[in-house]
Each structure stands twice: as structure tokens, then as C-alpha cells.
From Swiss-Prot:
CDD domains: SCO. It holds the Pfam family SCO1-SenC. Cu cation binds at residues 122, 126, 213. Expressed in retina, retinal pigment epithelium, and sclera. Disulfide bonds join 122-126. Residues 68-255 are mitochondrial intermembrane. The lineage of its organism: Eukaryota, Metazoa, Chordata, Craniata, Vertebrata. Belongs to the SCO1/2 family. This is Protein SCO2 homolog, mitochondrial. GO terms for cellular component: mitochondrial inner membrane; mitochondrion; myofibril. Homodimer. Interacts with COA6. Found in a complex with TMEM177, COX20, COA6, MT-CO2/COX2, COX18 and SCO1. Interacts with TMEM177 in a COX20-dependent manner. Interacts with COX20 in a MT-CO2/COX2- and COX18-dependent manner. Interacts with COX16. It is found in: Mitochondrion inner membrane.
């Protein structure tokens, strides 16, 4: 068209160039907004996509936690079964408590029991382990939904740990800590039932000696069955959590 009008007409058309550019630009811009608007209406909004992503992530998290809990429960069941097959604590015992009253295993039926074997002349390990045991008992006492756990201390040194010595010793830890002692044969029998090793060392010039022995805290359920044990490396918090799980599992299978 410009060629048909000739060069002389071009200056007259120059005044329309801005209008053409502006008009075309506006048209293109409006079309772009129209297309963009159509694209936004066709798909979910940003909030919807974020909500879907959050729900999906929460679902994955819940599934992971459920799988982890199931795996932990399976491990606990396997451990409990292995401990039962070890035949620990299945026999009875006959001892005297720190008040001079006879005690046997049946006296603790219906209670959860934490039991530790040691001796009152122990310089450090026994006091530390008994203090840890008492911490566990106190933490569990602070939870009203949980049953009381009975702490028990059985000596492996009956030669020195008579009733009076046990009474003096246990009062330093917890008012409900029960000390048990007996004759050499009675203590040996109870120790064998729980697979506890102990051996008195040589006496020094003051007739003092150290007793080497197994270091473990035993957990018995209300049926009197050995349920678990905890070595020195286990903290009070770890033991409390383990006992919580055992209590929950025990009550879940009650008729």
C-alpha cells in the first residue's frame, strides 16, 4: 500500500505509526492477559496446590510414624519372647526383708517390680545403679495413669548384709525400697534363678572385701514373669520409656 501511494505520501502516514504501535501493543497486551487468565482458570490455584502438597506430606509422615511404631512393637515382642525362653526368674525364692519379714516371689504378684542385686559395702556402682532405679520409680510415680512399681534390692553379700544392715541402707534411697537378705544358701538360690553371677574377693587386713557381681536392673510384670533387664548403659529416661511400653503391652493382652 505504501509503495502504491509513493514516497511523497509516507510523511503523512508517519503520524499514524505511534497509533499503530500503541494500538497493536494494547491489543497484544489485552490478548496476553486474556490468555493468561484462561490458563489460570484452567488449573488449581497456588493455595490449593500448597494445601494438596501439605496434606500429602502429612500423610507420608503419619505413615512413616505408624510403620516405625509397628516395627518397634515387633522388636519389643521379639525381645520379650527371647527373654522368656532364657528361663530367667522362673523359680521361687525365700528371703527376709529389711524388717525381718519372710518374703517369697508370690508376695509380689500383682505388682510391677524393679529388682537389683548388689551389696551395701559397694563403693560406687551399687549406689549409682540404685539411685538410677529410684529415679525411674519416681518418674513413674509422677504419672497417675501408670501403676506403682515396687523397687527391690537383694544382697549378694549375706555375710555382712543382715536385716539391720539392709534396713539402714535402703532408707537412704527411697521409702518404698525393699531390701532382701537371707542365708548364704537362700541368696545363692535367688541369684541362680535370675542368672546373677557374684564372687567375693580376697579380704584385706581389715577383713574388708569387694564382691564382684552382675550389674543389671530386672523388670518383673504383675504375673511375676521376668520381662526385661537394663544394664549400666541405659539411662533412667530410657528405662522409663521401656517400662511404659511394657505396661501398655501387658494391659493390651488382658482379657
Amino acid at each position: 500500500m505504501l509503495l502504491a501511494l509513493g514516497p511523497k505520501a509516507w510523511p503523512k502516514l508517519s503520524q499514524f505509526k505511534p497509533l499503530l504501535r500503541i494500538s497493536g501493543g494494547e491489543t497484544l497486551h489485552r490478548n496476553s492477559r486474556h490468555w493468561a487468565g484462561q490458563g489460570q482458570r484452567q488449573g488449581p490455584g497456588l493455595r490449593t496446590r500448597l494445601l494438596i502438597t501439605a496434606l500429602f506430606g502429612a500423610g507420608l509422615g503419619w505413615a512413616w510414624l505408624a510403620a516405625r511404631a509397628e516395627k518397634e512393637q515387633w522388636r519389643q515382642q521379639q525381645r520379650t519372647e527371647a527373654l522368656r525362653q532364657a528361663a530367667v526368674g522362673q523359680g521361687d525364692f525365700s528371703l527376709l526383708d529389711h524388717k525381718g519379714q519372710p518374703r517369697c516371689k508370690a508376695d509380689f504378684r500383682g505388682q510391677w517390680v524393679l529388682m537389683y542385686f548388689g551389696f551395701t559395702h559397694c563403693p560406687d556402682i551399687c549406689p549409682d545403679e540404685l539411685e538410677k532405679l529410684v529415679q525411674v520409680v519416681r518418674k513413674l510415680e509422677a504419672e497417675p495413669d501408670l501403676p506403682l512399681v515396687q523397687p527391690v534390692f537383694i544382697t549378694v553379700d549375706p555375710e555382712r548384709d543382715d536385716v539391720a544392715a539392709m534396713a539402714r541402707y535402703v532408707q537412704e534411697f527411697h521409702p518404698r525400697l525393699l531390701g532382701l537378705t537371707g542365708s548364704t544358701e537362700q541368696v545363692a538360690h535367688a541369684s541362680r534363678n535370675y542368672r546373677v553371677y557374684y564372687s567375693a574377693g580376697p579380704k584385706d587386713e581389715d577383713q574388708d572385701y569387694i564382691v564382684d557381681h552382675s550389674i543389671a536392673i530386672y523388670l518383673l510384670n504383675p504375673d511375676g514373669l521376668f520381662t526385661d533387664y537394663y544394664g549400666r548403659s541405659r539411662s533412667a529416661e530410657q528405662i522409663v520409656e521401656s517400662i511404659r511400653r511394657h505396661i501398655a503391652a501387658f494391659h493390651s493382652v488382658l482379657p
